[in-house]
């Protein structure tokens, strides 16, 4: 199997994973228009090639919240990562730490905070949802701090779960879902042994630690469905600040007015994100939303972006549009599913190589030199 780009990992992951898991990661909301536009809008952005600039010295490193990153990339929070490889959160975190970038742990990870944090030699980030069960939120924050987490990623674009039609077709949800998942596992023996058997326990570790009992996939779906909180407002985030005094990033911003509100609230950063096209179909792609948001709040807080990033070239595009750092989700998850920690390591090396080529050929010797002047054409131009 030849792996030369993240798209190769996607194809290999589709062969290796049971369909319910592949499509859970790969799918989006409703008819998946936004999911597709996340990728196509980035691809339509033309870079400005510059030559003869003596690019013998090049630096991809950047600073973010008193951390030095080897490149402006972090691994995004992805629920159920531990179902894609044996103890997947640990493997992904180790690959990220070895490359000198942050790993963001999802609230709904398979491995608990206490298993992942000691496995790496740099602080990880922790992602938290807005939930009705404030006791769980408080418990998660306390455990994150105790584990040495410095940065909180607070996801605000899930007051209700998105309508993901693919999940019903694949067996992730819907009629006879449990039976279909078992049958699919039986026809994917490599995954069934490595993850299904050797990757146990299949609890949602952070939730099980709080509830005091094993929480499997069916419980995960039911518990989350009952705990999303549509009543959340900016005032509720003040409650979070009572329990978290470190850097806080608000994830799920697509509008400049919301970005300005994040500044007023005192957020340290935002993630320009449509949840990978998994929440509301028909909203702007992150690439389309980013320039106006950067114009509104650049310099007032750190701007991160995700959704649709499939290569180091896409990272350069997002930085040129106004991001300080990007998050990658599906790309690392596919690599993890195929080759575990080694796959994520290789993917990050591919991203770095692609970034270096793009920077050399656009004349940017450092991340700070990647600006809108690096673009020939922005979206809609």
From Swiss-Prot:
Membrane topology per record: Peripheral membrane protein
Keywords for the protein's UniProt record, in alphabetical order: Cell inner membrane, Cell membrane, Flavoprotein, FMN, Membrane, Oxidoreductase
Keyword Transmembrane helix: no
EC class (word): oxidoreductase
Main location: membrane
Catalytic activity: (S)-lactate + A = pyruvate + AH2
Cofactor: FMN
Active site positions, chain numbering: 275 (proton acceptor)
Name of one Pfam family that matches: FMN_dh
Localization per Swiss-Prot or TrEMBL: Cell inner membrane
A Gene Ontology term for the protein's cellular component: plasma membrane
Top-rank lineage group of the source organism: Bacteria
Residues holding FMN: 106, 127, 155, 251, 306-330
InterPro entries in alphabetical order: Aldolase_TIM, Alpha-hydoxy_acid_DH_FMN, FMN-dep_DH, FMN_HAD, FMN_hydac_DH_AS, LldD
Summary of the function given for this chain in its UniProt record: Catalyzes the conversion of L-lactate to pyruvate. Is coupled to the respiratory chain.
The protein's name: L-lactate dehydrogenase
Protein source organism: Pseudomonas putida (strain GB-1)
């Amino acid at each position: 199997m030849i792996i030369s780009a993240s798209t190769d990992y996607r194809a290999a992951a589709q062969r290796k994973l049971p369909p319910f898991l592949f499509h859970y990661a790969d799918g989006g909301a409703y008819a998946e228009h936004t999911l597709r536009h996340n990728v196509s809008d980035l691809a339509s952005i033309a870079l400005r090639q510059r030559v003869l600039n003596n690019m013998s010295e090049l630096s991809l490193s950047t600073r973010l919240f008193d951390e030095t990153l080897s490149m402006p990339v972090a691994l995004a929070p992805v629920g159920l990562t531990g179902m894609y490889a044996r103890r997947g959160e640990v493997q992904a975190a180790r690959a990220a730490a070895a490359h000198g970038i942050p790993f963001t742990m999802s609230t709904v990870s398979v491995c608990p905070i206490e298993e992942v944090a000691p496995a790496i030699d740099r602080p990880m980030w922790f992602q938290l949802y807005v939930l009705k069960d404030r006791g769980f939120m408080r418990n998660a924050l306390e455990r994150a701090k105790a584990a040495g987490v410095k940065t909180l990623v607070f996801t605000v674009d899930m007051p209700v779960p998105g309508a993901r039609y693919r999940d019903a077709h694949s067996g992730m949800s819907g009629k006879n879902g449990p039976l279909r998942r078992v049958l699919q596992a039986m026809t994917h023996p490599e995954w069934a042994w490595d993850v299904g058997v050797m990757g146990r326990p299949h609890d949602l570790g952070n939730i099980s630690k709080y509830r005091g009992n094993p929480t499997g996939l069916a419980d995960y779906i039911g518990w989350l469905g009952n705990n999303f909180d549509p009543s959340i407002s900016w005032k509720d985030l003040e409650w979070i600040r009572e329990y978290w005094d470190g850097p806080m990033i608000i994830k799920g911003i697509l509008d400049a007015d919301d970005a300005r509100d994040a500044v007023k609230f005192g957020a340290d950063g935002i993630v320009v994100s449509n949840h990978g096209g998994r929440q509301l179909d028909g909203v702007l792609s992150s690439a389309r939303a980013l320039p106006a948001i950067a114009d509104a709040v650049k310099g007032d807080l750190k701007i991160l972006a995700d959704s649709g990033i499939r290569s180091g070239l896409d990272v350069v595009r997002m930085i040129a549009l106004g991001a300080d750092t990007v998050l990658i989700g599906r790309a690392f998850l596919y690599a993890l599913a195929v080759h575990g920690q080694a796959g994520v390591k290789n993917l990050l090396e591919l991203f770095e190589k692609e970034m270096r080529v793009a920077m050399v050929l656009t004349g940017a010797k450092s991340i700070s030199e990647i600006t809108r002047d690096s673009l020939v054409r922005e979206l809609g131009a």
